[in-house]
Amino acid sequence: MHFRDNVILQAKNGPLDFQPREPYAPVFDQIKKTPLMAELQITQEYLGQSIHLTYLAPMWKEFFSFVSPQSLKGIAGVANIGDDTNWCGHHFSQANWYAFGRLAWNPDLTSEDIAKEWLLQTFAPEVLPSALDIMLRSHEACVDYMMPLGLHHIFMADHHYGPEPDGNQPHFPEEWKPVYYHKADSAGIGFDRSSKGTNAVSQYREPYCRDYDNLATCPEEYLLWFHHVPWTYKMKNGNTLWQEMQQHYNRGVSEVEDFVRIWHSLKPHVDEQRYREVDERLQKHLQNAREWRDVCLGYFGKLL
């Protein structure tokens, strides 16, 4: 296929669809002659929408650690603004719109740099240390209570909010079903994209092709993306896979519980309206995080 000289191909950052964590899309390795730009999702379609406090700059910086900004002609963002008075639904979701713009202008900025800038322009200086702590921990917390260790696509059908690990709607194509992606059974869990499975790993450049293909060298944050792993598999810290999954889900919920406590400590430094509106969302956030943990561990636990 030959494109005109003015064509720039736009590709999503990951191979699937803006999951809480994905490996980078190998299209950025394979397309060498046509200029590329990356598509990032500012709106939190799969990361709690406008309810969860999830700062996305760390996720985007993770992508840029694999795909150099210098190799791209630009980035596009799926915006998160709407008809809310605060534009983004959640006051802290404004930080994601801001972070996208700052990274588009200067991709060398750190997630912490950007969060500090935004906080100092948005809240009183006394809010900075504690709110910064929440923001920088929030993405990893989201991954933990939703889809840790490389799990993906286990959200509710249609609206993409909340967990549905048992999703197996007969009228949906296979590749729309959560059970197609986690492939959990009594033997283990995960999608085998190794050279012994679909061989999706072959699309990656070295050393990632080799590292992702080998169960022993595959980064644990992508483990279940690339491998179907026995429940009794020993992780690097000595836990079995099942123990590690439980630890991640519980840690994610504990993090959100801590976010609520931290926000409450900031009440003297935040105006009444914004304090109340953020707190209301944090309460729903915590409820949702517990639901994700309980539903997912309950479903997978029955398979062991």
Describe the residue ranges of each PLM region.
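Catalytic domains of carbohydrate-active enzymes that cleave complex glycans
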Residues: 70-304
